[in-house]
Amino acid sequence: MQDIPLIYWIPKMHKNPIGSRFIAGSKKCSIKLLSKYFSKALKLILNHMKLYANTVYERSNLNYFWIIENSLDFMDKIKNKSIEHMETYDFSTLYTALPHPEIKRNFSKIFQKVYNREGKQFINVNLRQASFSSEGKNNCCSFRVTDMMEILEFVLDNIFVRYGRKIYKQVVGIPIGLDSGQDIANLLLFSYESEYVEKVSKQDLFLARKFNLCSRYIDDLFVGGFPNFKDHIYKIYPRDLEIKLESNNIKEVSYLDLKIRSEEGRLDFSVYDKRDDFSFEIVNFPFIESCIHKKSALGVFYSQLIRYARICSKCEAFKAKAHGLVNRLKRQGFKLEDLRKKERNLS
């Protein structure tokens, strides 16, 4: 029983009313290692799909791959684009609403496609990497296409969580905390998105290219230059998923850790932290008198300045964010002269 993930609750204090997030703590779960290896194999498959989608984009100017790695990846994608209209959406029930039969059906097609394109029988996985291979190896786990489907079905059919003295089986969705959970969600949404763009392109190429400025980071979706996107949401994704429009201003949106403003089509970027909007104070940087070494604590300041510099389009935005950070760290015991020494390293 100790090997069954323990479910615990985290409040979303910034929501009104206060929201909930349930996590399955699977650190000691009996399928932990299998799920970890499966996660690496899924990432390899997703990378194959990314490379394939890049080729499609180069040849036909169609965006099959909306997934981004981080905010810098997203900025590289859109910073030189002229965008007058922006929207952001949130998949509020992504993990809890994914239908198991839908996952199995879509993944069966994806696995077959990828293995056939690669022309290799195996995905060899160890703790460091995963790769396609013509033969299995003794020092790693070797997965055929049939093995991948068996693992997927086993993982989905054996999701149990422990709550107090009771054990529950999850029959819809996947738990947050499962190693391969994020990869399963990402790959499933990718299958919906790519299939829809491909389908539309055969009927209306101009409309299909309207999706070129769509980007998604797991359950956060950005849509640029496509005012009618909302008409397509439930043609792309199943209605089991609850998808909410987050933005209320087409000229200024917050996405990931970015605030994006459209000024006559040109994009202006600055740093956004949703925790700044909380009605209560939080501690997200170390105190100088904590157990953290002084050098490491000052390194946090330096790394944040680099992040601000990479994101901010205008010097004024960088200065405002840096000034706020300095004031916060001073309240937490940092000396101004130490911060200034670190700041000089940027020049």
Stretch-by-stretch model annotation:
Residues 170-175, 179-183, 190, 194, ...:
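Active-site and adjacent loop segments of nucleotide-processing enzymes
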Residues 1-13, 43, 47, 51-55, ...:
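Acidic/polar, low-complexity linker and loop regions
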Residues 1-85, 92-93, 108-112:
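Non-catalytic, regulatory and substrate/membrane-recognition segments associated with hydrolase enzymes
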Residues 18-21, 32-34, 46-47, 96-99, ...:
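Short helix/loop capping segments that flank catalytic or ligand/cofactor-binding pockets
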Residues 7-8, 21, 86-87, 253-254, ...:
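A broad, low-specificity signal marking well-ordered, structured residues that form hydrophobic/aromatic
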